[in-house]
């Protein structure tokens, strides 16, 4: 999938499934681990790799998409299912197994140039192709970023000891 994320960028970004670009697996796992640690979530690189393996198998979800610009890996985003043990823990309005946008990451040098938008758009398209009619996410730091892109806050809760906003967008 080719996306032109911003008029200021002359060449296009290429968005691909991680399973089709296995050479980037270790870097993506490192980014996931790094972001978990930044957010105060207990993690290990081995655990991130173990979980990411599920994203490159034949199942439809979980999946990770990567962004390549000028032949270089610059970002990623994941689609995952979080299972709930009871309907009381499920966000109000969620279906039984909602798809969540997770692990959005763009290298700092490439931020604020439309690459994050391109990754989100590609993830939304992928989820829509699977028959999903909405995506969910939890955000701590960048709630405004998502709200400007049509996401709505459904509730606020605590996750891994941090206050987060649970958000949803229709597809």
Residues covered by each model-derived region:
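Conserved acetyl-CoA-binding loop of GNAT-fold acetyltransferases
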Residues: 147-157
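Conserved acetyl-CoA pyrophosphate-binding loop and the N-cap/start of the following alpha-helix
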Residues: 110, 114-122
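C-terminal "cap" of GNAT-fold acetyltransferases
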Residues: 133, 137-142, 155-171
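Conserved N-terminal entry element of GNAT/NAT acetyltransferase domains
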Residues: 1-27
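Conserved beta-strand in the GNAT
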Residues: 64-66, 72-82, 87-90, 100, ...
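Helix-loop element at the rim of GNAT/NAT acetyltransferase active sites that forms part
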Residues: 29-43
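Active-site rim helix/loop that mediates acceptor-substrate recognition in acyltransferases
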Residues: 40-69
């Amino acid at each position: 999938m080719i996306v032109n994320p911003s008029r200021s960028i002359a060449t296009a970004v290429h968005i691909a499934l991680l399973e089709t670009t296995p050479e980037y697996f270790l870097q993506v796992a490192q980014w996931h681990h790094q972001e978990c640690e930044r957010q105060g979530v207990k993690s290990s690189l081995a655990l991130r790799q173990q979980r990411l393996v599920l994203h490159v198998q034949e199942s439809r979800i979980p999946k990770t998409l990567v962004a390549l610009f000028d032949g270089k890996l610059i970002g990623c985003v994941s689609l995952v299912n979080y299972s709930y043990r009871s309907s009381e823990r499920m966000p109000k309005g969620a279906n039984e197994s909602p798809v969540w946008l997770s692990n959005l990451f763009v290298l700092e040098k490439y931020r604020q140039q439309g690459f994050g938008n391109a990754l989100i758009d590609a993830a939304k398209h992928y989820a829509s192709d699977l028959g999903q009619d909405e995506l969910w996410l939890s955000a701590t730091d960048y709630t405004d970023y998502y709200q400007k892109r049509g996401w709505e806050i459904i509730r606020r809760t605590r996750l891994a000891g941090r206050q987060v906003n649970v958000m949803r967008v229709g597809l």
